[in-house]
Amino acid sequence: MKPGIHPEYRPVVYRDKGADFAFLTRSTSTSDQTIEWTDGNTYPVIDVQISSASHPFWTGKQRLLDTAGRVEKFRQKYARRGPQSG
């Protein structure tokens, strides 16, 4: 790798405030905010709206949509009512 052209790769804390969940990983992302982690060190923190701790796919709280019912409702609403003159 060429020196001086790549962003710094360092430890960063990602925090999902909605799920009260945070994890420490390595990233090139930057932040002005910091947090003291459980190991006593201070790391940049990036707040996210959704993570594996709050996403319905990963939490098992999925909501299935009745797409067949919606399609049938659409067909009934816009079905042709016989031959149109014109």
Swiss-Prot record:
<comment type="similarity">
    <text>Belongs to the bacterial ribosomal protein bL31 family. Type B subfamily.</text>
</comment>
<dbReference type="InterPro" id="IPR034704">
    <property type="entry name" value="Ribosomal_bL28/bL31-like_sf"/>
</dbReference>
<keyword id="KW-0689">Ribosomal protein</keyword>
<protein>
    <recommendedName>
        <fullName>Large ribosomal subunit protein bL31B</fullName>
    </recommendedName>
</protein>
<dbReference type="GO" id="GO:0003735">
    <property type="term" value="F:structural constituent of ribosome"/>
</dbReference>
<dbReference type="Pfam" id="PF01197">
    <property type="entry name" value="Ribosomal_L31"/>
</dbReference>
<comment type="subunit">
    <text>Part of the 50S ribosomal subunit.</text>
</comment>
<dbReference type="GO" id="GO:0006412">
    <property type="term" value="P:translation"/>
</dbReference>
<dbReference type="InterPro" id="IPR027493">
    <property type="entry name" value="Ribosomal_bL31_B"/>
</dbReference>
<dbReference type="InterPro" id="IPR042105">
    <property type="entry name" value="Ribosomal_bL31_sf"/>
</dbReference>
<keyword id="KW-0687">Ribonucleoprotein</keyword>
<dbReference type="GO" id="GO:0005840">
    <property type="term" value="C:ribosome"/>
</dbReference>
<dbReference type="InterPro" id="IPR002150">
    <property type="entry name" value="Ribosomal_bL31"/>
</dbReference>
<dbReference type="GO" id="GO:1990904">
    <property type="term" value="C:ribonucleoprotein complex"/>
</dbReference>
